[in-house]
């Protein structure tokens, strides 16, 4: 089988169409064209053509992978998954990854270090969440253990406290005890240990005093009483107390406040 002509592709000047015996047969990257010294008049066997096609697949996949990496650093697993989606053959994926490693495009340790530092500085995620994400990205336990040590106890408490302040602002209608429980639970879900979560919760709510809680209780009582005014006094009172207890206020605190402020439900008849 003889190459009868070679033409440059109109949409990609770095790729060439190869015609064998006057018919289009395949296309190759410029690097593959030069490596196999493809030129008009050259005779190729079927085995040689298959070898050229495989080499071109690797070259094409390598170009795609480098472009994929141009947006941000990736783990080896992320690149492998990307190449699979590009319908690359397994042999090509393995060869591409080897070439990328040789070119220093892949380094899972550096990737894990950079990813961890970025998450610590920009997302306020807890260490367990970051560990889980690194596992999903294909990092080994050894690498994960190594890089997560960079997340110091001091940084964890600082970030957890910042998260706690945000949670507190979104839940400023609850009693202090309930608020602390809410903050602790949310922080654990965000990847912090229970010890760090509790410490951050206490730190964030430290400046809430009795006056603040009394003010919150007053507003909640007024709101709940308006909501329950359609009920008879005894039912309205019970519903109000139940609602307030669900927000973390103790029964004794509610009763004391109602008594001290002479709040009566009789007026709602």
From Swiss-Prot:
Q: Which domain of life is it from?
A: Bacteria
Q: What's one GO-annotated cellular component?
A: cytoplasm
Which GO terms fall under biological process for this protein? Answer: regulation of DNA repair
Gene3D superfamilies for the chain: Winged helix-like DNA-binding domain superfamily/Winged helix DNA-binding domain (1.10.10.10)
Report the subcellular localization.
Answer: Cytoplasm
**Primary localization:** cytoplasm
Q: Which InterPro entries match?
A: RecX_HTH_1st, RecX_HTH_2nd, RecX_HTH_3rd, Regulatory_RecX, WH-like_DNA-bd_sf
Cite the Pfam families for this sequence. Answer: RecX_HTH1 (PF21982), RecX_HTH2 (PF02631), RecX_HTH3 (PF21981)
Q: Which UniProt keywords apply?
A: Cytoplasm
HAMAP family per UniProt: RecX (MF_01114)
Q: What does this protein do?
A: Modulates RecA activity.
Family statement drawn from the similarity comment of this UniProt entry: Belongs to the RecX family.
Supply the name of the protein.
Regulatory protein RecX
Annotated organism of origin: Listeria welshimeri serovar 6b (strain ATCC 35897 / DSM 20650 / CCUG 15529 / CIP 8149 / NCTC 11857 / SLCC 5334 / V8)
Q: Which gene encodes it?
A: recX
């Amino acid at each position: 089988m003889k190459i009868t002509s070679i033409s440059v592709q109109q949409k990609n000047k770095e790729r060439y169409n190869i015609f064998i015996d006057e018919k289009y047969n395949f296309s190759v990257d410029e690097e593959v064209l030069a490596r196999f010294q493809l030129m008009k008049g050259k005779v190729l066997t079927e085995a040689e053509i298959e070898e050229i096609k495989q080499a071109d697949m690797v070259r094409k996949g390598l170009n795609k992978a480098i472009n994929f990496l141009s947006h941000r650093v990736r783990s080896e697993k992320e690149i492998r998954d990307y190449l699979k989606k590009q319908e690359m053959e397994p042999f090509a994926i393995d060869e591409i990854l080897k070439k990328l490693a040789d070119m220093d495009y892949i380094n899972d340790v550096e990737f894990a270090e950079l990813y961890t530092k970025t998450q610590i500085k920009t997302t306020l995620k807890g260490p367990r969440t970051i560990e889980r994400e690194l596992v999903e990205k294909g990092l080994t336990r050894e690498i994960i253990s190594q890089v997560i040590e960079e997340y110091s106890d001091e940084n964890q408490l600082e970030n957890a406290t910042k998260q706690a302040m945000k949670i507190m602002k979104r839940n400023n209608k609850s009693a202090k005890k309930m608020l602390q429980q809410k903050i602790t639970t949310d922080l654990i879900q965000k990847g912090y240990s229970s010890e760090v979560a509790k410490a951050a919760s206490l730190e964030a709510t430290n400046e809430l005093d009795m006056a603040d809680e009394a003010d919150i209780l007053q507003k909640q009582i007024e709101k709940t009483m308006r909501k329950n005014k359609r009920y008879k006094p005894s039912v309205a009172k019970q519903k109000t107390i139940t609602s307030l207890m669900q927000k973390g206020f103790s029964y004794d605190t509610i009763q004391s406040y109602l008594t001290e402020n002479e709040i009566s439900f009789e007026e709602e008849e």
